[in-house]
Every structure is written in C-alpha cells, then in structure tokens.
C-alpha cells in the first residue's frame, strides 16, 4: 500500500473524526497524545496524518500535500477549491443561521447590514432570496455586532445555540445544515485510487452501520 496522507482540522471536528478512523482499523494513538506535534504516522498502516487549521485543509488537499482531507462543509462552501468532495461523514453537524437581537425584523424592506465570518456564503444566500444586503466581514466573535449596532444581524454557525443565548440573540432563519466532509486530491484519486477508495468504502460502511 502506498502511503496516504490525511489532513485533519484541529479542534472540534478532530474529536468527532478520530473515532471514525479508529473504527475502520487505523491506529490514531499518536493523534490522541499529540502534544504540540502536527504530523503523525499511524502505527499499523501506511497512513499519516497532518493537523492544520480548518480553513487550510482544503488548500493542502488541493495542492497535493495531503491525499485526503476532512473538513467542515462550511469551509468548502466559503472557499471554492479544486478537489473532490467524496463523503458526508455525518459528524460535526451544525447549522448556518441568521441571528440577531429580539427586535430585529427580518421582513423589513430596509437594506440590512449583516456581520459574518462567511461573506461568500452570506452573499449567495441573500442573493438567492432576492435581498440586497451590506455584508461586514468579522474575524472574531460576531455575536457582539448587532448588540453594539454594527450590524442588523449576523450569519454564523450554530451548534447548540448556547453562545447566542448567552449574548441575548435568537435565531431568525436556519439557512443550511452542514457537517464534516471527506475530500480528495484529484491527482491522488488516479494514482492512489485503490488505497483511497479502500478508506472511503470502509468509512462509508462504518457510517451506515452506525445509523
């Protein structure tokens, strides 16, 4: 088997995804005891892992540094990359939502100002609804934008809604459901087809058996 390099996101998705790889027989003990390391070799297979920021996973896969990647659908929607999206892993499920303070009126005809970390997704969503909005990109916590009057509402990923609730915001619209996706480098799918499809097929069977 030729070596397969897999890019994973650090943080929340990492905790959901590692058990899936273990369930298909890939040793992830180094990943679970990683310290500050970012590159790991599975002990019982020709598979290695790299841990990078979520926004960089698709870039590493697109450029062939990683053969396979696992990343949230939000990253793929916001950043168009020349990769294959192969499998919905069904973990890390969240929703894109429009949220604001209780006095926000989503039906107002006044041009709205929306704060978000996801300007591309937000622009497409409101364009499809036929609404002209001003979009302000925020890198940090967007929840504060409507509270301080920077924006009328926000577009953000909501998992439990606890952060919104703690800041006095409520969800006005649920836009899209998102989850972790397995992506593949286009060239690698040709040169390492058997190895990659072996992983994908085992993962798919594991997901189906768990439903």
UniProtKB/Swiss-Prot annotation:
Q: Which UniProt keywords apply?
A: Amino-acid biosynthesis, ATP-binding, Cytoplasm, Glycosyltransferase, Histidine biosynthesis, Nucleotide-binding, Transferase
Tell me where it resides.
Cytoplasm
The pathway to which it is assigned is: Amino-acid biosynthesis; L-histidine biosynthesis; L-histidine from 5-phospho-alpha-D-ribose 1-diphosphate: step 1/9
Report the protein name in the record: ATP phosphoribosyltransferase
What InterPro entries does UniProt report for this protein, alphabetically? ATP_PRibTrfase_cat, ATP_PRibTrfase_CS, ATP_PRibTrfase_HisG, ATP_PRibTrfase_HisG_short
Report the source organism: Bacillus cereus (strain AH187)
Main location group: cytoplasm
Gene Ontology molecular function, alphabetical: ATP binding; ATP phosphoribosyltransferase activity
* Entry-linked Pfam families: HisG
Q: What is known about its subunit structure? A: Heteromultimer composed of HisG and HisZ subunits.
> Quick one: which gene encodes this?
hisG
Instruction: Please give the record's comment on domains.
Output: Lacks the C-terminal regulatory region which is replaced by HisZ.
Q: What is its EC number?
A: 2.4.2.17
Chemical reaction(s) catalysed: 1-(5-phospho-beta-D-ribosyl)-ATP + diphosphate = 5-phospho-alpha-D-ribose 1-diphosphate + ATP
- Taxonomic classification, please? Bacteria, Bacillati, Bacillota, Bacilli, Bacillales
The keyword 4Fe-4S is annotated on this UniProt entry? no
What Gene3D superfamilies does the database record attribute to this sequence? Periplasmic binding protein-like II (3.40.190.10)
Regarding protein family, the annotation reads:
Belongs to the ATP phosphoribosyltransferase family. Short subfamily.
A GO CC annotation recorded here is: cytoplasm
What biological function has been recorded for the protein in this entry?
Catalyzes the condensation of ATP and 5-phosphoribose 1-diphosphate to form N'-(5'-phosphoribosyl)-ATP (PR-ATP). Has a crucial role in the pathway because the rate of histidine biosynthesis seems to be controlled primarily by regulation of HisG enzymatic activity.
Q: Which Gene Ontology BP terms does the record give?
A: L-histidine biosynthetic process
């Amino acid at each position: 088997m030729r070596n397969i390099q897999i890019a994973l996101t650090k943080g929340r998705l990492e905790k959901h995804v590692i058990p899936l790889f273990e369930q298909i027989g890939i040793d992830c003990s180094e990943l679970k005891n990683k310290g500050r390391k970012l590159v790991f070799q599975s002990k019982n297979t020709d598979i290695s892992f790299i841990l990078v920021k979520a926004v960089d996973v698709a870039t590493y896969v697109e450029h062939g540094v990683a053969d396979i990647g696992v990343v949230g659908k939000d990253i793929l929607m916001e950043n168009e990359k020349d990769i294959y999206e192969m499998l919905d892993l069904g973990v890390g499920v969240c929703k894109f939502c429009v949220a604001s303070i209780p006095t926000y009126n989503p039906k107002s005809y006044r041009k709205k100002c929306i704060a978000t970390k996801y300007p591309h997704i937000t622009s497409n969503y409101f364009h499809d609804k036929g609404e002209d909005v001003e979009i302000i990109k925020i890198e940090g916590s967007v929840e504060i934008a409507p509270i301080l009057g920077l924006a009328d509402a926000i577009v953000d990923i909501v998992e439990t809604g606890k952060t919104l609730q703690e800041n006095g915001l409520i969800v006005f619209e649920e836009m899209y459901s998102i989850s972790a996706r397995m992506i593949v480098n286009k060239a690698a799918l040709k040169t390492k087809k058997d190895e990659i499809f072996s992983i994908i097929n085992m993962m798919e069977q594991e997901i189906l058996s768990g439903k």
